Amino acid sequence: MVFYFTSSSVNSSTYTIYMGKDKYENEDLIKYGWPEDIWFHVDKLSSAHVYLRLQKGEKIEDIPKEVLMDCAHLVKANSIQGCKMNNVNVVYTPWSNLKKTADMDVGQIGFHRQKDVKIVTVEKKVNEILNRLEKTKLEKFPDLAAEKEGRDREERNEKKAQIQEMKRKEKEEMKKKREMDELRSYSSLMKVENMSSNQDGNDSDEFM
């Protein structure tokens, strides 16, 4: 089971936040995450793994402040120790930075690049945020592997279409270039013929 929440920015952009029911489900979330996903976890404490799905083309720096705080409050609320504390640090990083090796326990992860891990602090629990998120909560049983394949297939099709469009434009540019070269060549030929014609006319005048 995966829990889904909806968060909105001040400019009305909506984002999906999701988390697994337990550490075993977290394994699938780690395995089938998307490049657009940002992972959240309470720093140095046990907590849920919360993911934020960005819009295509967005980066971690583009996360709206209010959406970032929604994610941080949600992950803090789902930490047995963290939910009782103030000034809790929450780490977050792109899904692609998560490292999972065979010797790690279930639900445990590391990072490929520590420099890509950011921290946000939740000073204290804000019920208004949690209540708002709770109203959007949905429980689903998604086929994560199929969803990931569908996303990757769509990306491949988009790239294929972009390549085809690029080739079409290149072909069109080459055609225009050939036409311009032919036009310049024809213009040069006409100039030469005109010069020859004028030269012939001058010769005739001299003989007269």
Curated annotation (Swiss-Prot):
Chain spans, region Disordered: 144-208
UniProt note: phenotype after gene disruption: In the context of cancer, mice display reduced metastase formation, without affecting primary tumor growth.
Membrane topology: Single-pass membrane protein
N6-acetyllysine PTM sites in chain numbering: K23
Protein name, per record: Coiled-coil domain-containing protein 25
Biased composition (Basic and acidic residues): 144-184
Topology feature Cytoplasmic, residues: 123-208
Intracellular or extracellular location(s): Cell membrane; Endomembrane system
Regions annotated as coiled coil: 117-187
UniProt gene name: Ccdc25
Extracellular compartment residues: 1-105
Domain of life, source organism: Eukaryota
Record family assignment: Belongs to the CCDC25 family.
Annotated GO biological process: positive regulation of cell motility
Signal peptide limits: none
Regions crossing the membrane: 106-122
Species name: Mus musculus
Keywords: Acetylation, Cell membrane, Coiled coil, DNA-binding, Membrane, Phosphoprotein, Transmembrane, Transmembrane helix
Region (DNA-binding): 21-25
Pfam families, per database record: NFACT-R_1 (PF05670)
One term under GO cellular component: plasma membrane
InterPro entries assigned to the protein according to its UniProt record, in alphabetical order: Jlp2/Ccd25, NFACT_RNA-bd
Record keyword Coiled coil present: yes
Function field: Transmembrane receptor that senses neutrophil extracellular traps (NETs) and triggers the ILK-PARVB pathway to enhance cell motility. NETs are mainly composed of DNA fibers and are released by neutrophils to bind pathogens during inflammation. Formation of NETs is also associated with cancer metastasis, NET-DNA acting as a chemotactic factor to attract cancer cells.
Single Gene Ontology MF annotation: DNA binding
Known partners and oligomeric status: Interacts (via cytoplasmic region) with ILK.
Entry-annotated residues carrying Phosphoserine: S204
